[in-house]
Amino acid sequence: MEANNRRDFLKKAALAGASALMAPTLLAAEGKDESEFVLSPSKRTDSKLIVPKNNGLKITGTFLDEISHDIPHQNWGEKEWDLDFQHMKRIGIDTVIMIRSGYRKFITYPSKYLLGKGCYMPSVDLVDMYLRLAEKYNMKFYFGLYDTGHYWDTRDMSWEVEYNKYVIDEVWNTYGEKYKSFGGWYISTEISRNTKGAIGAFHTMGKQCKDVSNGLPTFISPWIDGKKAVMGTGKMTREDAVSVEQHEREWNEIFDGIHDVVDALCVSRRTHRLR
């Protein structure tokens, strides 16, 4: 009986999958528009939400994760990005942040400086595209600085400062003075602890961003090197995690050294055991 039930389930699942794949073809053959079968605003389930509409905490900004450490690059053209911006606008997003303008040899715009350092020529100028789409949908775009990759290899932050002092000037001269949607800067170097040289590096990059752009806002995204920060280790927890108290002490020191050139922070991933 159990085997028969399993076979029946598999047959039904296969038929359901085939139906889903065939639906667009059948609709096209009948001359029907797929959009007829998309939920319209009047058919949505807003009235059944546990938190009534507009009473929840609003999310108005999001990252554009085009060049990432561990997420594959999006194989999107401008049409797909335009649709994504439309969706973001509809749900209340008014700020988009490019998480980084490049990582090691992959870059998002044809930077003369970075190409001269051996980076690959991008097929599309993503920075220009994002800025145009941000203007089209009345959003603000934050530019994420370049990540050399050297910090992750050596824990030496001087590489980030050296490369980005050219990137910041180059980007502002190319895009900042051209687009009103250029709204600020994201200092993309992510740290958890008071790493040697961190305060000086963040201050130098933040100050240059503000100086060239007449004071546009800057922000960072720190994380906590907590007990569950185990990505890539094969472990569930770690014993050498920073305590919440030590984390607070170190970040008080960091903030004290950068508060005049860094305006805000967006707390990044990683978790710590609740007490």
For the regions a protein language model found, what residue spans apply to each?
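Positively charged, low-complexity intrinsically disordered regions
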Residues: 7-8, 45
